[in-house]
Amino acid sequence: MDLKILRDKQEVGAAAANHAAQSLRRILARRDWARLIAATGASQFEFLKALTSAPGIDWHRVELFHLDEYVGLPITHAASFRKYLLERLIRKTGITRHHLLDGERDSGEVIREVGGELRSDTVNLAFVGIGENGHLAFNDPPADFETEEAYLVVELDEACRRQQVNEGWYSSLAEVPTRAISMSIQQILKAEEIIAVVPDARKAAAVKACLEGEISANAPASILRRHPNTTIYLDRESAALLSQAVSRSI
């Protein structure tokens, strides 16, 4: 695992986007299609803005999947991850081959359909974040590290739901859905390359737990340390609690 610490979230977004753009160009040079998983949330704003402006990427040859979606949330809601990806990635790039998780449909049917498409070929690149509770996608602690299902329905813990309020997606905890469809941990780890974009001081405790603590279901994103080709981008604030030894050696 490679660790990059930049000055602020703007530098994180620019550096991670440059890395992602280079990876996509390399993939498209050797394959007809690049198969991509994208993350959502406030931590991805600067990254996706920079990436969608990067030159030399044939986005019409990119097949897109995403990590998670709330069960029962309409696409018109500001917090809908389908809405997020349509506005911040798909429409800006012209991606036409995308598989969005429809939280308004029967979850079992969505999981079968999108999971089947996801597993039909190798995923080349995955963009992820780390939650304030250490979650990876919506796999809150204690996460299921064993299931081989592509997606699963999960119960969202209170820390995760409060994060959504604090980021401004909802005005109260009562408004935040309690269940979501989430890509599984094992499915995320099947990606050939993972780029994690994790700025902000509010992520510092989770970053420390995931990078310095035991690899544990209680710190779900700690599992990224077992992936052979992962790069984590932090800013000074999200890296603030790391020991110097860790920040130098990872």
Per-range role (PLM):
Residues M1-L36:
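N-terminal glycine-/serine-/threonine-rich phosphate-binding loop
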Residues R25-P55:
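Glycine-rich N-terminal segment of FAD-binding domains in flavoprotein oxidoreductases
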Residues A38-S43, V128-E132, P199:
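Glycine-rich beta-strand-to-loop/alpha-helix junction loops that act as flexible
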Residues K49-W59, P141-A150:
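A glycine- and small-aliphatic-rich helix-loop capping segment at beta-alpha/alpha-beta transitions
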Residues D58-F127:
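Ligand-binding beta-strand-loop-alpha-helix segment within the catalytic cores
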Residues D121-E146:
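Glycine-rich phosphate-binding loop
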Residues A137-M183:
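Class I SAM-dependent methyltransferase SAM-binding "motif I" and its flanking Rossmann-like core
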Residues M183-Q186, K190-I250:
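ATP/nucleoside-binding phosphotransfer catalytic cores, i.e., glycine-rich phosphate-binding loops
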